[in-house]
Amino acid sequence: MTASKTKTEAVAYRWQRYYHTLQTGHYLTVKTKQRLEKSAVFQTQGSLDGACCLHVFAAVLTILGLAKHDALADMSRRKYGVPAEVFQAFRSTYFDGIHAHDFVDLVNNELMLPLSLSLRQAADGGLDKWTMDNLMRGELMACTFASVKNRRTKHWVLCTGCEGSASGRVIKPDTILVLDPSGGEAQYAAFNARMVVPQTGPGSRGGKTVDELQKSKSSKPIDWMYESPIAVNEPVRLTAAVRFRLTEWS
């Protein structure tokens, strides 16, 4: 008599992954090849300025080892180096902010940095999936979003990673982890806010995941639920995303 085989249930769990050089702790830090010591990442946006993009870009420069965190925090008083050049390029946007395509043009045309920027906007189609696919590959991203309800909320955040569920070999990402410059310091985490595909209630669309909702470029954009400890949860849509990659100094 042969023994019958019983099917074992697949192990189910939640997972998170974030950019590989980020180190969590009392506050979020990064360890780069260019610096001996770990460096803080977060830059705080003020209550009067519209420079969320500049604060996000400063965090990107720190993470990629292109400038020191403290020097970037003092960029308006710097006379030389990358922080001074960044402030000169972005000073006119400090109160009004900047759109994603203008940001990419400004970095490419005004700053001689070893960066390769890839931009996708909502009009290009497939923005949600493109963003999540890059985060799943471990890329460093920034995105812009707007409120679904009134469009008055328009904001930049740094995408530090993603989150989702897994059952056996099936992995389903459903959350973008972000570092919001208007929020507080990320403590013992690589994010201080997140954008979640609702599983129930308004905007849930049957509890489907990003891959299921974004099968083609013509798919309807996802209404993400933006969750932050300092604000009421709000449905938002991605309007653009930028991928950052290091190149060689010319």
Predicted regions and their residues:
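Noncatalytic regulatory segments and standalone regulatory/sensor domains
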Residues: 162-250
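Non-catalytic, low-structured ubiquitin/UBL-interacting segments
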Residues: 1-40, 250
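Generic signature of intrinsically disordered, low-complexity, basic-rich segments
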Residues: 6-8, 54-55, 237
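Residue-level signal for functionally critical sites in structured catalytic/ligand-binding pockets
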Residues: 12-13, 18-26, 30, 45-50, ...
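Cysteine-nucleophile protease catalytic domains, especially the papain-like/related folds used
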Residues: 37-121
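Conserved active-site-adjacent core of cysteine acyl-enzyme catalytic domains
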Residues: 14, 19, 84-203
